[in-house]
Every structure is written in structure tokens, then in C-alpha cells.
Amino acid sequence: NNGVNKLRLFDIESVDESIVKEGITFDKEAIEKNLTLFLYPDDSDEAGNLLRIYQQYFMVSNAAQLILMEMKEKQYDLRKMYDYAVIQINDTHPSMIIPELIRILVNDKAFTMDEAIEVVSKTCAYTNHTILAEALEKWPLSYLEKVVPQLVPIIKELSARVAAKYSDPKVQIIDDQNRVHMAHMDIHYGFSVNGVAAIHTEILKDTEPVSYTHLTLP
């Protein structure tokens, strides 16, 4: 059909490729040197978890800014973003796109919180790929406070809105252990939820969100 899609790759100039030879023993705390060198680094300790959060935020923030830049170039109405774009959240790794996009719309684009949440919720969709724990991420709130403190108030607001609407602890974004359930955020603040295959959709129906009776999954 003569259509061409662009593949955008994000990187930072400070990355030190010489540390690749160190393999999995590299210094995970040297974020400016290793941020984009190793995908899914060892997360068996706190430093590895924080690096993953840094990586995820780096990618989603760049993507959010790119989407808004391209919409401005095309003179699209940001308040109808969902008419021009769909942001597909595959697994929970890009889940921070939701609070990040809300943050930018509120801080830089003169949206109210309600307006930003509505637009983002109509633009983002979530696809479950697995039921493995590493895919359905649950980040300690304290980790997010270290890496992305600017997103924490937004995540708390999103969680509070869910808590005001649903009392079931199984569907909360921030649980009683102060862990942020990224999949729950995607489910509550996306317009579509499905599995990458039929079995993954059934997993969503039968296991993880057994209390999401307010949702209709395909």
C-alpha cells in the first residue's frame, strides 16, 4: 500500500560502550554510562530494579514527547489525541507512558487533571503477554520515588480515583504494601484490554484481574 512506518530509536550520548565487555558484572548504578546498553538487566537487587525503571522511563518519556511533537507539526488537536493516535502498551514495561503523558499535558499543555486523564485513557490500550511476575510488574513506590518522583503524585492520584470507585483490594493500583501494580494502572486507564493470543486473554479473565467484573474483555 506504499505506506511507510518510521522506527524510532532513542539513545543518550553519555553511554560508554566499552563496558559491554564487562557483561552482567557492569556497574548498574552508573546510569549515564549504561542506560541503553543492556535490555532487561539483572534485577536481582535494588540497583538492577532501579536501572530497569530508569530504562522504562527513558523510553516512554521520549515516546510521549515525540508523539506530542509530531501532533504539533501536523496541527492536530491534542484534546482529540485519540482520534489520531493509539499508544499500545505491550506488557507492563511501557506502563509509565500513562502518568508521563498526563504529566506533560497538565504541566506543559494547560490541561486540567481530569482532561488529561480522559484523553490519555482514550488513547492507551494494554495487551497482556504473559502471567509471569516479571511481566506483570509491581514496583515498590519507594523505587519510583527515587527514579521518577515527578510521576509519583500522578500515580497516587490515579490510584486514589480507583480506590474511591472500587473497594476491592485486588484491583487497586497501589496496594497495602505500597507496591504499584502497573497492569492495574493499564487496565483502569486504557480503552482496551486484551491478550496477545486467546490464551492470554483468558488468563486475564481467569486469574490476574478476577475482580475486574466492570470490564469487558474480547
Regions found by a protein language model. Name each.
Residues 213-218:
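Conserved small/polar residues in nucleotide/adenosyl-binding loops
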Residues 187, 194-196, 203:
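Extended catalytic-interface subdomain
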Residues 106-156:
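Extended, well-ordered alpha-helical scaffold/bundle regions in very large, multi-domain proteins
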Residues 153-179:
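Polar, glycine-rich mid-to-C-terminal structural blocks
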Residues 88-100, 123-127:
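Core structural elements
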Residues 61-65, 100-107:
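Alpha-helical support elements that line or immediately flank enzyme active sites
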Residues 3-86:
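Function-dense linear segments that define catalytic or interfacial modules
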Residues 70-82, 105-118, 130, 134, ...:
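Secondary-structure transition/capping motifs at alpha-helix termini
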